[in-house]
Regions:
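Bacterial N-terminal signal peptides that target proteins for export
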Residues: 1-7
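Bacterial N-terminal signal peptides
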Residues: 7-15
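Boundary at the C-terminal end of the N-terminal hydrophobic targeting segment
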Residues: 18-20
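Extended amphipathic ligand-handling, pore-lining, and cofactor/metal-binding catalytic surfaces
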Residues: 171, 175-212
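N-terminal amphipathic/hydrophobic interface segments
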Residues: 23-52
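Hydrophobic/aromatic beta-strand elements that line small-molecule binding cavities or substrate pockets
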Residues: 160-165
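Long hydrophobic alpha-helical segments typical of transmembrane helices together
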Residues: 202-232
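N-terminal beta-strand/beta-hairpin edge segment
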Residues: 41-118, 130, 138-151
Length: 232
């Protein structure tokens, strides 16, 4: 149903006669934005969209101001919440037919997102079937994970300490600084395989608006992230 809604709105926009400046109703643009957003978020997500100053100029859809609130927002099983503000957005109408919208221009983009240790803990269980009963503790700037890793019929109690790292400006990775694995004949790739399943924890490059991590804070209550369209 989401894809059907997307193509309906796309058809309405593409078939509209090109004019010097043609207004769009808030409802039309909201449907378009919601259809695009639902391609990137899991079904439990609750999204609210507010649009103002939308118009067609030639082959462009221009939105002066766009706010999106996701509470909760779920991405690949990781639950959190976010607030997105976009100003001065220009989108090519022809790009709607591809189903993957890339904005031609965004004057300003700001995203504030956060998640909790409980949500991360739940997501770890979903991401890896070999990770049994993971428990995560967050401290200022670091974390500790305790879990049992399963490989075939063997079980390996594990304690790992680490931090979060920004990679390439757009990804957030779990980086381990110290790992203790109990058991005999521990496979050399045991930890590496688990990290490969988890990382990247966040990947902003997958979204239609270019965003870069501006600030990443890890504290006792959870994780907070600030992203903008300005690359440092």
């Amino acid at each position: 149903m989401r894809q059907a809604g997307f193509w309906f709105v796309a058809a309405v926009l593409i078939c509209a006669p090109a004019a010097a400046q043609q207004p769009f109703t808030d409802d039309t643009v909201t449907q378009l934005v919601m259809a695009v957003l639902h391609q990137y978020f899991d079904s439990p997500s609750m999204l609210e969209v507010s649009v103002s100053g939308a118009a067609q100029v030639g082959d462009l859809l221009i939105v002066q101001d766009l706010l999106v609130l996701g509470k909760p927002a779920v991405v690949h099983g990781l639950r959190g919440e976010f607030l997105l503000h976009l100003a001065g957005v220009e989108v090519e109408l022809a790009a709607l037919t591809s189903g993957t919208i890339k904005a031609r221009r965004v004057q300003k983009a700001t995203v504030v997102a956060k998640s909790t240790s409980a949500a991360i803990q739940e997501a770890l269980s979903r991401w890896s079937g070999s990770l049994i009963n993971p428990r995560i503790q967050l401290q200022n700037g670091s974390f500790t994970v305790t879990a049992i890793l399963r490989r075939d019929d063997a079980l390996y109690p594990t304690v790992a300490h680490g931090a979060l790292a920004v990679v390439g400006g757009q990804q957030v990775h779990l980086v381990l600084t110290d790992v203790t694995v109990s058991g005999s004949n521990v496979p050399v790739d045991l930890i590496g395989n688990e990290l490969a399943r988890v990382n990247p924890l966040v990947d902003l490059s997958k979204y239609p608006i270019r965003l870069f991590v501006d600030r990443l804070v890890l504290h006792n209550d959870g994780i907070e992230l600030l992203a903008t369209n300005i690359k440092k």
